[in-house]
Amino acid sequence: MMVPSLSTSISSPALFKNREGGEEGNDGGLEQLQNQVNDLGDLNFNEEGDYNNDQQPTNEEEGTADNELESLMSLVNDNNNNNNNTSGIDDDNNNDIDDNNNNNNNNNNNNNNNNNNKEGLNDLFISSINVSTLLNDLDQLSDTHSHASVSNQSSNGSVRRGYDIKTQRSVGTKGQGGSSGSSPRSNSLRVYRTFPYRGDHHFSWLNNIRDVDSSEDPNSCHNSNNNNKNNKNNQPSSTHDQTNINNNNNNNCNDNEKPIKPNSTNGIRHSRKYKGLQQLDFLGSNIILPQQQQPQPIEDNQQVVPQPFQVDAESNYNNNNNNNNNNNNNNNNNNNNNNNNNNNNNNDNENNQHPINPVNTQNTQQNVTHSNNNNNNNNNNTAPPNQWSELIESLGYGSQSDEQKTFGSTLDDLNNANSCSDLKDLIVDGISINNETSPSQSQEITDFSKIDNLNKNININNNNNTDSQQPLPSIDVNFSHNNNNNNNDNDNNNNNNNNNNNNNNNNNNNNIQDIQIPYHQNDQDYNIQEGNDINNDNYEIRVSNNDDDNDSSNNNNNNNSKFQENLNLLNTGMGGRICKTDQKKQLSRTITFADPSSILSFFGSIPTDEDQNNNNNKNKNTTTTTTTTNTTTTTTTTTSASAAAQNKLDLLSSLSAGQSSGGVGGGNNVLNSSSTPAIKVNHQHKVTEQNRTSSKISLSTIFPKLPPFTNQQSPPTLSPSKYYYPLLQPEPTTLIRGFSSAADINKRGLKRAKKPMEMEDVYLTQYPLGDDQDSQIALFAIFDGHSGKGCAVAAKEIFPNILLKYIKSTKNENGGKPIYDMRGVFLNAFKEVDAQLSKFEYEGATATVCLVWRAGHQRFVQSANVGDSTAFLSYGNETLFLSKDHRATDPEEIQRIKNDGITLTEGQTRINGLMVSRALGDHFIKHLNCGLSGEPYVSPPISITPFHSHLIVASDGLWDVISGNRAMEIVKVQQTEEKMSNSLLQCAIGSIKAKDNISIIVVTLQ
């Protein structure tokens, strides 16, 4: 049952109708209950509903009250047995909310308790908790029933037992058997406060929104239960009638639509006004419009501003421009077979006439025609000029300000003179701005202000009067226009279905028009040809000398346009006739320079003026003549067919001389250009190539080859792409940035492995190597001894001097040239060190030695090792091996031993008790000829690039725990070399896998 919020409601099981008999006229129980309630009104109840009479009753009064209470309880229990939706009795909690009306009635819209005599009981508002006042209010509700005496009701005799739903036990009065019942107050009347959900005054505005929506939308369906919720005149006497009324209330609704709750908070989400209060499109315009929009007649020359919202597909826009011309264009989609076609587009459905959509040149197929009819003055477009078409036009062709910024003046007059749709795609002297996309998607180039080298500076005049005295050569310009499917133009648009007999326009543009445009300087004309090409959409201009053309042009004309092109467009990929199929991807490399000296050393010194003049004289076979007047300066350069394109510096000098004194002065327009031979162009843009000379830098000068190895032996099987870098790198200030070392005996690991507590690892770091402080060589080595540390310590002492000796000897053999490969040095040094360790017969050591040195402007790193101490070099996100583990289980080592004629047993993992197959010392094993060797593995020399950041050299105690990739990840997150080495050491010591000594060297190269 719906109760107004923050109000007090009363619920009593005894107030409901006794349905045991199933007859509507059986109201005896109700009358008896009402009489008992009237008698209880004389009793004194406190505010909490307890029976606390201040006056002490006498025995007779006490007995009478007990009898009355027992009689009332019997009636309550009787009603509880006959009512299937009775609220339970709770002695401790009086705040339970049991909606008996909702349980009795299956319809939630009308609150009817099937009690015709108590219609207003559910709408009772209780302002206080005074039970006496409540009982009086209940008494006033009984208008149609007469009061019956208590004696008639007491003749029933028995008190029926009730059942408490919550406590799950039977209840009854005293002396009637069963468990003891509750007090009359708890069993008969339940007072509670409802939760504030509906009916609050804060939600009253939702009803107004719903009412307004109902009035605006006649077809909208809303629930009408608000008006009939508590309608007393229409309340049925049974649930069946109640359901019928609810069905009648929803007759105007669809079957799938559910009635909206009157005061539900969902009304905000379901409200049409809330959903579309300010629903805007992507441009911020309100798209909510009235449902009916009357079309307004469109007058001549009237601009229609379209609205940025979607229009029905059936809506058409009619432009009623009636002209007397026989060649009028028709904008509708019907087949017009009349001879005299007018632009009267009749729309059958006038109610759907809405403002048109913005012009979409991609989805609209437009055929461009150039009419030769002199009487055709029709300038109708598919869409009238508006803000959307102007925006698209500006994006496609360039705004007026951009034209003025780029060309110095607008192109409107030039377009009108040439009957051309666009002059953006021009090729002047083999230079063009190619527009590969449709005009609507063309990208305009406005960055001409940054171009220093000018190729053409052309001023076009359209007057026939001339003041020129001497015959000037003409410029033949081949102007080719290619129509694509989505071609846009400022001229008239015709459908292919227009079959006008008097129409002289050729929609397929098969006719080629030759248009002569007067040209100022040297009587040069543009010969513009228009043709159809299915591949490109380009305009090409070719300049040629025509001595036979004696036509003259006018100097005085205000309608002129100049456009500037540059030879740099060829280099930037914007010039020339570039087709999609002709484009090739070019490889590029990034070269970093540390200082300007590196740039000069990379590209070489700047050429002097004498060198450039000598280069220019090779390409010239004629002289340059310069004619200077008081107002203008004209420079003309004649070149041969073999030297069509001159040096950029020569062109700049010639143009700068013309620009210094040239320009528009005294009403005269000046052309400053260099003419080139004619290029025959057909309408399919098949152009013969010119012989052009351009300065090229040899690749060998940019990427010099590395010198050959000092040792002719080929490097081991490693990918050369990761080790050889022919790029010149900037010269760093230092050889390395820093290095750090860390070592630990790892007692816990040795104890787990049951090894002697002895540190057998030795590390070596020397920078610079040798006594020379300017030496650009760094040495980093790890020696891991076995069977003692004597051999490792001895190798550490003698290795640096032996290496330095062989480095000097190798440099002397090469004539003092830098060493790019230390392979020979490593092989000789390891051989001599192993020979000097011959006294260590029963001791040995693994050795991993890394050298970092500078050769010229480059740095190199190279490693050599015997045993299982590994060196790693970072390369970006990769990790490169600089060493190779020599163990008896390695397949390559097994094959090497077999090649030496030594037989190995199947599954052999050690060589005379050693896990390694190569080591320093251990000469008693080497004398046995069982496969142990002292020859090192030498890695290829690696040119250090900015991608090589760290070098890690460590004993097998570290690599038994973590991998090289993981070690590089740990190192790269640290800031200093000391933290890098300590992080690796702690990571290895903390692992249960560590069972050996640990020695680590970390070198930062960048």
Curated annotation (Swiss-Prot):
Biased composition annotated in UniProt, kind: Polar residues: 1-12, 146-158, 466-481, 525-538
SUPFAM superfamilies named among the record's database cross-references: PP2C-like (SSF81606)
Binding site for Mn(2+) 2: D784, D956, D996
Protein origin, superkingdom: Eukaryota
Residues binding Mn(2+) 1: D784, G785
UniProt domain PPM-type phosphatase: residue ranges: 744-1005
Assigned keywords, A-Z: Coiled coil, Hydrolase, Magnesium, Manganese, Metal-binding, Protein phosphatase
Protein name: Probable protein phosphatase DDB_G0279461
Biased amino acid composition, Low complexity: 77-88, 100-117, 220-234, 244-254, 316-387, 482-511, 552-561, 613-639
EC number per UniProt: 3.1.3.16
Gene3D superfamilies membership: PPM-type phosphatase domain (3.60.40.10)
InterPro entries: PP2C, PPM-type-like_dom_sf, PPM-type_phosphatase-like_dom
Region Disordered, annotated ranges: 1-119, 146-188, 214-269, 312-387, 459-513, 525-563, 604-642
Source species of the chain: Dictyostelium discoideum (Social amoeba)
Pfam families in the cross-refs: PP2C (PF00481)
Coiled-coil stretches noted in the UniProt entry, renumbered to this chain: 65-122, 450-516
Catalyses which reaction(s): O-phospho-L-seryl-[protein] + H2O = L-seryl-[protein] + phosphate; O-phospho-L-threonyl-[protein] + H2O = L-threonyl-[protein] + phosphate
UniProt GO MF annotations: metal ion binding; protein serine/threonine phosphatase activity
Cofactor field: Mg(2+); Mn(2+)
Cofactor binding note of this UniProt entry: Binds 2 magnesium or manganese ions per subunit.
Positions with biased composition (Acidic residues): 59-69, 89-99
SMART domains linked to this entry: PP2Cc
One Gene Ontology term from the biological process aspect of the record: signal transduction
Record family assignment: In the C-terminal section; belongs to the PP2C family.
